[in-house]
């Protein structure tokens, strides 16, 4: 399916209760409900994919990986949660794409963009000496006789992913980057980066670990319970409390 179709899909968005009914059917083995959930959430997946473009990967490949994250979120979503499905799904989709990129090794940046990035770096050094200050993007573009947007694109493409994704929790050197949430101007509104960071920073260490294991490591509540030495019921209760706390703080921030 063409990327533009995914990006500009005009399917009417489902209401939250409709989404949850489809999730219930899907979790009970209804393949049609599962397929419809994918179809209706293409825009959601594509919005996440846009965060990872210009990394040397085909958008279609990233979209397919994102759909795997979407399906995992369908399978793992607890219907007793008082939270929108999209709020739960976005971190899962992000995590799936990040794992794909991490497991694939060094992020592949196209050779032409790499070469342009090197030219920009040299031009920046030369202009800094000449001007006695850091040159603007437009000055670099004029110097190289290219468009300013090409300068921005090349710099973004060769930048290390670790400098783009801000770490909000780290466990044994493995960072959680839930701040890779995306802003959206439609009625489906997701976590704001700064507010989310503040909400997570207010959690207790055990609560942060639960967020990390559940939303970044994709562990089940039973696996988290075993890791923490508590029951699955306790994990479920704590997770609901955490989501409610974050939701309240996010709502307060939005207000």
Swiss-Prot record:
Entry superkingdom: Bacteria
Regulation: Interaction with SpoIIAB inhibits sigma-F activity throughout the cell before the formation of the asymmetric septum; after septation the interaction is confined to the mother cell, and sigma-F activity is released in the prespore. Fin, a second, forespore-specific anti-sigma factor is induced in 2 successive waves by sigma-F and sigma-G, by antagonizing sigma-F it allows the switch to sigma-G factor and progression to the late sporulation development stages.
Chain residues forming the annotated DNA-binding region: 221-240
GO molecular function, one term: DNA binding
PROSITE patterns, sorted: SIGMA70_1, SIGMA70_2
Keywords: DNA-binding, Sigma factor, Sporulation, Transcription, Transcription regulation
Entry-linked Gene3D superfamilies: 1.20.120.1810, Winged helix-like DNA-binding domain superfamily/Winged helix DNA-binding domain
InterPro entries referenced in this protein's UniProt entry, alphabetically: Cro/C1-type_HTH (IPR001387), RNA_pol_sigma-70_dom (IPR014284), RNA_pol_sigma-B/F/G (IPR014322), RNA_pol_sigma-F (IPR014236), RNA_pol_sigma70 (IPR000943), RNA_pol_sigma70_r2 (IPR007627), RNA_pol_sigma70_r3 (IPR007624), RNA_pol_sigma70_r4 (IPR007630)
Position of sequence motif Polymerase core binding: 61-74
Induction: Association with RNAP core increases during sporulation but not tested stresses (at protein level).
Any one of the GO BP annotations: DNA-templated transcription initiation
Pfam families per record: Sigma70_r2 (PF04542), Sigma70_r3 (PF04539), Sigma70_r4 (PF04545)
Result of knocking out the encoding gene: In spo-63 (loss of residues 27-255); no spores develop, no induction of sporulation-associated enzymes.
Quaternary structure and interacting proteins, as annotated: Interacts transiently with the RNAP core.
Function: Sigma factors are initiation factors that promote the attachment of RNA polymerase to specific initiation sites and are then released. This sigma factor is responsible for the expression of sporulation specific genes. Interaction with SpoIIAB inhibits sigma-F activity throughout the cell before the formation of the asymmetric septum; after septation the interaction is confined to the mother cell, and sigma F activity is released in the prespore. Responsible for expression of csfB (the anti-sigma-G factor Gin). Associates with the RNAP core only in stationary phase cells.
PANTHER family named in the record: RNA POLYMERASE SIGMA FACTOR RPO, RNA POLYMERASE SIGMA-F FACTOR
Family stated for the protein in its record: Belongs to the sigma-70 factor family.
Protein name: RNA polymerase sigma-F factor
Species name: Bacillus subtilis (strain 168)
């Amino acid at each position: 399916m063409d990327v533009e179709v995914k990006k500009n899909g005009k399917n009417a968005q489902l209401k939250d209760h409709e989404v949850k009914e489809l999730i219930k059917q899907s979790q009970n083995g209804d393949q049609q409900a599962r397929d419809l959930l994918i179809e209706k959430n293409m825009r959601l997946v594509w919005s996440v994919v846009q965060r990872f473009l210009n990394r040397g990967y085909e958008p279609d490949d990233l979209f397919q990986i994102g759909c795997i994250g979407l399906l995992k979120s369908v399978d793992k979503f607890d219907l007793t949660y008082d939270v929108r499905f999209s709020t739960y799904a976005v971190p899962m989709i992000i995590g799936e794409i990040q794992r794909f990129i991490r497991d694939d090794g060094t992020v592949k940046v196209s050779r032409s963009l790499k070469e342009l990035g090197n030219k920009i770096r040299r031009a920046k050094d030369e202009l800094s000496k000449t001007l006695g200050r850091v040159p603007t993007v437009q000055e670099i573009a004029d110097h190289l006789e290219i468009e300013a947007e090409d300068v921005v694109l090349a710099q973004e493409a060769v930048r290390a992913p670790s400098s783009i994704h801000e770490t909000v929790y780290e466990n044994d050197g493995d960072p959680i980057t839930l701040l890779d949430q995306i802003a959206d101007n439609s009625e489906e509104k997701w976590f704001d980066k700064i507010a989310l960071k503040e909400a997570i920073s207010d959690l207790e260490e055990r609560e942060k670990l639960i967020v990390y294991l559940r939303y970044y490591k994709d562990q089940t509540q039973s696996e988290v319970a075993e890791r923490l030495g508590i029951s699955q019921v306790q994990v479920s209760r704590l997770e609901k409390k955490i989501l409610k706390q974050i939701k309240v703080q996010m709502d307060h921030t939005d207000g």
